[in-house]
């Protein structure tokens, strides 16, 4: 299932811009205090670090990702998600715009 709209949020209007503009996101908070972000990764190969555990939900496009300690690239496309442990990192490879929601666990 792909999340298309989210109601009742507080949006951080200033964008987070990473990797010279290859990843742009906006943070938001749900009514219950849960924090998330929504963004896009443009065609590139990047490495992200995590503090909290994350669930990356693909809402459009697709990506290949490789979790820390793995040599295997896996694919995530619209309607799918993947989990990244806390205090870890992951590589992401994108050939078309990858739109996502990051759920912090």
UniProtKB/Swiss-Prot annotation:
UniProt keyword annotation of Transferase present: yes
EC top class named in words: transferase
GO molecular function, one term: uridine phosphorylase activity
GO cellular component annotations of the record: cytosol
Catalytic activity of the protein: a purine D-ribonucleoside + phosphate = a purine nucleobase + alpha-D-ribose 1-phosphate; adenosine + phosphate = alpha-D-ribose 1-phosphate + adenine; cytidine + phosphate = cytosine + alpha-D-ribose 1-phosphate; guanosine + phosphate = alpha-D-ribose 1-phosphate + guanine
EC number: 2.4.2.1, 2.4.2.2
Keywords from the named record: Glycosyltransferase, Transferase
Source taxon at top rank: Bacteria
Bilayer-crossing regions: none
Record InterPro entries: Ppnp (IPR009664), RmlC-like_jellyroll (IPR014710), RmlC_Cupin_sf (IPR011051)
Pfam families found in the cross-reference section: Ppnp
Record flagged with keyword Glycosyltransferase: yes
Similarity comment: Belongs to the nucleoside phosphorylase PpnP family.
HAMAP family: Nucleos_phosphorylase_PpnP
Known role: Catalyzes the phosphorolysis of diverse nucleosides, yielding D-ribose 1-phosphate and the respective free bases. Can use uridine, adenosine, guanosine, cytidine, thymidine, inosine and xanthosine as substrates. Also catalyzes the reverse reactions.
Protein name listed in UniProt: Pyrimidine/purine nucleoside phosphorylase
Source organism of the structure: Delftia acidovorans (strain DSM 14801 / SPH-1)
């Amino acid at each position: 299932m792909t999340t298309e709209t989210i109601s009742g949020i507080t949006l951080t209007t200033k964008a987070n811009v990473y990797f010279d503009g290859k990843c742009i996101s906006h943070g938001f908070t749900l009514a219950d205090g849960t924090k998330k972000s929504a963004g896009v990764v443009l065609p590139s190969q990047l490495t992200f670090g995590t503090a909290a555990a994350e669930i990356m939900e693909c809402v459009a496009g697709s990506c290949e990702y490789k979790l820390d300690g793995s040599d295997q690239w896996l694919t995530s496309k619209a309607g799918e998600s993947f989990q990244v442990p806390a205090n870890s990192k992951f590589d992401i490879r994108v050939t078309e715009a990858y739109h996502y929601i990051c759920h912090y666990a």
